[in-house]
């Protein structure tokens, strides 16, 4: 159920819409957290002990859109995890490239990899494959894990 702030009317959301919205928010927040941890670990490599991590508001819907992959994740679980991880990494590269091009077109892209080796048009870094491999498996787990039942005691 959802109550509209503008009209005060009650609007009923079906279970799938509610699940998708919850997963979108969960993925957006998880993605932000992963990005902040990753960028702060890069600061550590540069010996910047402030460990400052960064992200962008634009990244929330990009990470949140991982929720769209839940049905795909459920079907892929029969494959071995190395195969799934590779497929997910390639899908993330594709999503990163497409979203990066769109954001670049509007001069809003928060990342620029042109100064790094193994970049493609400054939008994706092929050396990030292991990170995207792990991230894909992380989001699979996040979106397919059954909620734990609360014990009464």
Show which residues each predicted segment covers.
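Aromatic-rich, lipid-facing transmembrane alpha helices and their immediate juxtamembrane interface loops
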Residues: 2-153
